[in-house]
Design a protein with these regions (language model features):
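Chalcogenol-based redox active-site neighborhoods
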Residues: 1-156
């Protein structure tokens, strides 16, 4: 099994195959609208604008598992991000990243970088995936998106 075998849900709950992103460099991030790290949306958007034409996609998965910091609906979250941070990368449906209801994609990501018991510790944990679908790096929530530039450039 690899990352392209998974299905994810868009903002409207419609299933999409991860294979849609074959050949792209991915930053997969769990986010929240009321978190101390929420201003990282700005840095994520800068990365997206800088590298999108070279093949970068940012996949934003809101998550309400950490201190109820993403209580809004999927649509409200997407609107918030677009309004306050001018995000243009794709926001997906809200998911769980830990526990028995953790999204299968996140179970896979954690297993690839951190081991099966390596729980997501907070919002804005970022995974970097190469063009072949390999999970190559995991960045802690406190790592600002701009600090990922070199790692992204190496994969582009």
């Amino acid at each position: 099994m690899n990352i392209y075998d998974f299905k994810i849900k868009d903002i409207d709950g419609k299933e999409l195959p991860m294979s849609k992103y074959k050949g792209k460099v991915l930053v997969i991030v769990n986010t929240a609208t009321h978190c101390g790290f929420t201003p990282q949306y700005e840095g994520l958007e800068k990365l997206y604008k800088q590298y999108h034409k070279k093949g970068l996609e940012i996949l934003d998965f809101p998550c309400n598992q950490f201190a109820n910091q993403a209580p809004e609906s999927n649509q409200e979250i997407a609107s918030f991000c677009a309004l306050h941070y001018k995000t243009s990368f794709q926001t997906f449906a809200k998911i769980d990243v830990n526990g028995k209801n953790a999204d299968p994609l996140y179970k896979y990501l954690k297993k690839q970088k951190g081991g099966i018991l390596s729980a997501i510790k907070w919002n804005f944990t970022k995974f970097l995936v190469d063009r072949e679908g390999n999970v190559v790096r995991r960045f802690a929530p406190n790592v600002e998106p701009e600090k990922m530039s070199q790692a992204i450039e190496e994969l582009l």
